[in-house]
Amino acid sequence: CGIYENTGQKMILTDERSKKTKLICNENYERMRGMQMEVAGFLALGILVGLLGALLGIGGGMVIVPLLVFVWHYEPQLAIGTSVLVVLLNAVSGTWGYIRQKKVCVDAALKFAVATVPGAFLGSYAAEYLQGRLFYLVFGAFFVLAAINMYRKASKNAAGKTAGVVPEVYNWKLGVLCSVGVGFLASILGIGGGIVHVPFMVYVLNFPVHVAIATSTCILAVSSLAGLVSHAMLGHIVWTSGLAIGAGAFVGAQGGVALAQRLQSGILMKLASVLVLITGIKFLMNAL
């Protein structure tokens, strides 16, 4: 009888171990599946960001930050820092495409890019103070004002600048001054800065829209690199998600570069303004 009892106990223990093993396997499978779905979502987001970023010369941060905050529930600083990483990869890809098309104004790109660096470093440290309602209020107000300005400026006259030429003489000192502020905003908000640079270059410095977009994308590559270094030092970056989104953005940016040649400048500006306005309203609603 003792033999049967021992055998029965062993069978029960074996069944329990088998159930535990299956449970662990199922948990691991679900965890892996969840990670795969998350990576797939990040890649898809990256492709969209790259497409819009290169198409409009705005880096894509205005899409990344809201989604990381509202969908993936990232802390503001982590969303901003991770966005800067994606903006860098997106801008590098877009710059490569625009340089091949010979649409980048090298002189302006070099001067303005260097000017963004000090502002980018300051912005990354200022981002430490964007907490709670202040974060949503600052983002919302900035996005709404920028959207109104962009839509108002997207007139038929602006569309005529698409086929224009780069002015031989432009106020580069004013451009440098603006670029310092752009670097600050890009780093503190994680948005790239093209949302300010493109309208400024078009309506103040009289650059053709497509040249302004291409040059702004090149400038973003430098300013976001400076911002990335300082955000990394502060521990603001989630590298796994940032690299996944960035990989998709690198691919999507090439599509944006190709599509930008076929659209009128007025359409580009209006598309950007609507997207920015929706995002700004969402942020302001969260600040209430």
Please state what every model-predicted region is:
Residues 151, 214-227:
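Hydrophobic alpha-helical transmembrane segments of multi-pass integral membrane proteins
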Residues 25, 31-75, 159-213, 243:
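Selected transmembrane alpha-helices and immediately adjacent juxtamembrane segments
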Residues 39, 43-54, 76, 84-87, ...:
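Hydrophobic alpha-helical transmembrane segments of integral membrane proteins
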Residues 81-137, 141, 224-269, 274, ...:
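Selective hydrophobic functional segments
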Residues 281-288:
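Juxtamembrane boundary at the C-terminal end of a transmembrane helix
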Residues 1-36:
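N-terminal amphipathic/basic-hydrophobic helices that include classical n-h-c signal peptides
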Residues 46, 50-58, 62, 90-95, ...:
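Transmembrane alpha-helical segments of multi-pass membrane transport proteins and ion-pumping complexes
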Residues 143-155:
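C-terminal membrane-cytosol helix-exit motif in multi-pass small-molecule transporters
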